[in-house]
Amino acid sequence: MLPTIFLLVAMNVFPLFWSLWLSFNDYKASSKIPPKFIGNANYTEMLSRQESWQSFTTTAAFVVMSVLLQLALGFGLALLLNREFKAKGIVTTLFLLPMMLSSVVVGLFWRFLMDTNFGLINFLLGKMGLMDPLKPIVWTDKQHAMWSVVIADTWQWTPFIMLIALAGLASVPKTLFEAASVDRATEWFKFRFITIPTIAPLLMVALLFRTLDAFKMFDLAWIMTERGSTVETVSVQVFREALRNWNTGKACAFAYIVLLVIIGLTNLYLMMMAKIKGEGPADAVPLFNPESPMIRGIGKFAPPVCGVLLIWGAYSAGGPAFVAVIGVLAAICAAIFFIPSNVRNILAYITMSIALFIYLAPLLWMGITSFKPFADVNVIPPKVVFTPTFENYLKIFADAKFMQQMMNSTIIAVVSTVLAVVMGTLTAYAFSRFKIKAKGDALFFILSTRMLPPMVVLVPVYLMFRSLGLLNTLTGLILLYTTVG
């Protein structure tokens, strides 16, 4: 167990302290000149840059938009799936497919779908009269780039919220609903005072993980918006400084500023979770207690406020027609608690089918496109009837590099996963079974590396691997993925 703990500490805590030291130095990783200590000059310069504050603003907007959308849609899908029906397992798995893809693949998917001239989305918007075909939407410009990245991220990670919410809904004791039914409680009462308080802690955990990941988002912004030119998040800013300008010291300083913000957000979430669970002071009122003034106030004022914001956002996004569509959907959602259960189940199945079709549409379209001849790909209107060909697949499998890449990826995935499970289990057992001094500090430092933008952790690891001769080797990648995972 000790070698396992030592390896985890070496691969996680060492980069943390090394990057912290570099943040106080004038240093370029591409240069052989040793670091020169300059105090807090890097922090002062990064905090005085307008680009740094703009990246924080952009990141905050992205986090709020994407995480709230994922929460609403994921929870809604979980409510739809929280019933017994045939093929429930298959339907749930289909909803999880986007989450199984890498962010790079998702970014390429949506960049192709949102292409200004040949994208399917612009074509459909033009056909529905929501866009002038002569003035197609440029999804990579400053006006629309944020929405394009939010849509792609929401599509990929909504199933994560759905999965956790579904697990929470399955754990709600049925006896509570039966007792409420005996008292002739309405469906809205059951939802508000039984369902929500029971699954709130799990939803907070899901929100914590998604907020941390969204705050570090890099792949989608880089791929979908011309290398982050129109959606420059903090991770894009760190990447430019660390691996484009090779200002390693400045990049590390900015990353630690980001880390402090993330730690603050994490503590805020943990405080809210403690209130939800009623683990605060003895005289504290739990956050989701029905008699709590906060909950009563939210229940009174939240619906009209949310309604006004929803109407304003819908009008800004799509005009009166879009407001009408949103209004109809909101009316259906409100009425669902007051209609007979058999009608509600029928509506749930219809909504689930529509949601599944919309969710799988990007995957289906990309699958269809993969069988098109190259000449039929970038054409308007898109060709639905064509002669399928396996030419694209044959070219890929005929490439020797592809087979080698698949082999390398498989080896790294299998070996690192097995080692991560074994090492993680042994380390967790050691931390829980034995009295280890500074156990909390060690866990904090290990988890802190997961809060930093990946590029900052990779710079010290890159320097360490370069000195050990582990660059461009399977051993180095397996070691990295094992300890980070």
Describe each model-derived feature in a short phrase.
Residues F301-W312:
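Canonical alpha-helical transmembrane segments of integral membrane proteins
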Residues F338-R344:
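Membrane-helix interface "capping/anchor" motifs
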Residues M1-V285, W312-V325, L329, C333, ...:
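A structural signal for multi-pass alpha-helical bundles of membrane permease subunits
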Residues G280-G297:
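Membrane-interfacial, low-structure loops and terminal tails that flank and connect transmembrane helices
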